[in-house]
């Protein structure tokens, strides 16, 4: 993944800008304006979310690609915002448990090899009462659309590392987080999800049956 995004970094904003206009509309604004306190953005990329965060948050950003982070650092300097940026893997976050009030991930889980492990890590670093905000393209619940996604998925995974059939709500639920908002747009392809970490762990179906 690092090699793909390092190579993509110089023209990433041009490509993703077209996709965003077609699919995601004001999704970044929706995600970032909900952030409070100490905030971790996972896969911050070139920093496209930076203009949308409230200026009173303490923002930390990680990304697997150093080249993408270079672009994010340049934008942060242009915005005169001291963002703490570092190279990091979403599947193994280098932060203590319960160290963030908000975790934000936009167009992220679609490109991570193990999205469930990434969500597990996001839940781990959230403080009790903290919020997880996700924006991504996902497996559509509409059968004809999903059939097309199934056809395209192997090609996109192979050449771009981009997965079309992810279901982040299931991964979030399995980590004991409480989903407060789940909305689908654009034929079910785009999902906006907001969840919180309860003060006490929520028993999932598996744990209730004594399997974990």
What would you call each of these model-derived segments?
Residues 1-11:
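N-terminal, positively charged/glycine-rich alpha-helical extensions of SAM-dependent methyltransferases
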Residues 15-18, 133-192:
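C-terminal alpha-helical "lid/dimerization" subdomain adjacent to the S-adenosyl-L-methionine
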Residues 18-38, 48, 52:
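Conserved alpha-helix/loop element of class I SAM-dependent methyltransferases that forms part
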Residues 38-92:
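Class I SAM-dependent methyltransferase SAM/SAH-binding core
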Residues 64-66, 114, 137:
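Short beta->alpha hinge that forms the Motif I/post-I loop of the SAM-binding pocket
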Residues 91-103:
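A short acidic, Gly/Pro-enriched loop at the edge of an enzyme's catalytic core
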Residues 102-114:
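A short SAM/SAH-binding and catalytic strip from SAM-dependent methyltransferases
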């Amino acid at each position: 993944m690092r090699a793909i995004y390092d190579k993509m970094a110089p023209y990433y904003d041009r490509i993703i800008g077209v996709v965003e206009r077609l699919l995601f509309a004001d999704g970044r604004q929706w995600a970032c304006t909900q952030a409070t306190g100490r905030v971790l953005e996972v896969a911050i990329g070139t920093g496209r979310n930076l203009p949308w965060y409230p200026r009173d948050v303490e923002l930390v950003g990680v990304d697997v690609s150093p080249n993408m982070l270079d672009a994010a650092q340049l934008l942060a300097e242009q915005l005169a915002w001291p963002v703490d940026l570092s190279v990091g893997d979403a599947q193994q976050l280098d932060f203590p448990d319960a160290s963030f009030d908000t975790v934000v991930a936009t167009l992220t889980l679609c490109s991570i090899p193990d999205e469930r492990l990434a969500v597990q890590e996001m839940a781990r670093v959230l403080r009790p009462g903290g919020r997880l905000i996700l924006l991504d393209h996902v497996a559509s619940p509409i059968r004809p659309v999903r059939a097309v996604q199934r056809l395209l998925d192997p090609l996109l995974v192979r050449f771009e590392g981009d997965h079309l059939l992810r279901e982040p709500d299931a991964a979030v639920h399995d980590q004991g987080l409480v989903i407060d908002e789940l909305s689908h747009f654009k034929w079910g392809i785009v999902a906006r999800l907001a969840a919180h970490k309860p003060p006490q762990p929520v028993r999932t179906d598996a744990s209730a049956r004594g399997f974990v």
